[in-house]
Amino acid sequence: MASGWWLVVLAGCGRYRDFTLPQQPGGPSVTWKWQARPDPVLTRDAAGEWDAVDVLNPSVIRQGDAYYNFFSGYDGKAWHTGLAVSGDGITWHKEAKILSPDPGTWEGSSIAANGSAITDESGILYYYQAGDPPQIGLARSRNGHQWQRNGTPVLTRGPYGSWDERGLGDPYVIRFGRGYYMFYLGMDRARRQSLGVAASDDGVSWYKLRGNPILAPGAYGTFDANGVGEPAVWASRGYYWMLFTGRDGGEMRRLALARSRDGVHWDKLPMVIAGDQPWDSKVICDPSVIVNGNRVTVWFGGGDVAHPAQNIHGQIGLGELLSAPH
């Protein structure tokens, strides 16, 4: 991880600013190789359970000697967040459902999931999608089992005419130095889905980049022509890297890679990753990464039905990106 703090230019006031992440030095070109286990590592439960229809959106962190996976489960009516624990990141034990949407609050009744977990001095912070229109909430925990919600969204949709006026989703939060950064999906009036970034001093009060979006859908006929989403960001080998999901015109979903030196200006790379097993033949999405040297472990969602949301027979797989200089 880079040291230091973000560069901020106060070009105005309110909840928008100009900033970058700490500058990365760059370096030699890097070749990435993808390999994945053939079978899912976290599967749907039996009919009638809270995660019987889809299991997607892993967010994996280390807690001592264990891996904690905060994943999303769909029961046919609503999305919930559950916790699974593993000693090796491969064999998982489902602990419990930990968050469900609260209809008596801003969250509504359809979703409290699609989240991103990180740790700081206060414990575990879990940023999740909820509400209609969708926005980003925050829950905190000391142990991963008992949670306290923030009460109001920490990141809200943009004003009329903005790139994210219809709603937000797919948060992915990282820390560099003293800063928190959230990469997220925004949807405009035409329902185009792009990616943006926000920054925070404390993980609670956020301001959006004035120049959002930072990653847009591709041209007609490309793998991401229908939208981009579900980012996962890390730093290694002199750059920031982003795995993201692209949706094509037939709603097939694939993963792709982008690169940046400042976390704001991104270049899409040629690498596109498609599912190659029957269970993820139509959709591969929702990456969550842990970096260990030249090896990036990637938990991801997959399905065998081409659909932009749920009912894809979703399950969670495990892969690796291995890097080497040219």
What does each model-found stretch correspond to?
Residues 1-11:
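Sec-dependent bacterial lipoprotein signal peptides
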Residues 12-326:
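Carbohydrate-active catalytic/glycan-binding domains of CAZyme proteins
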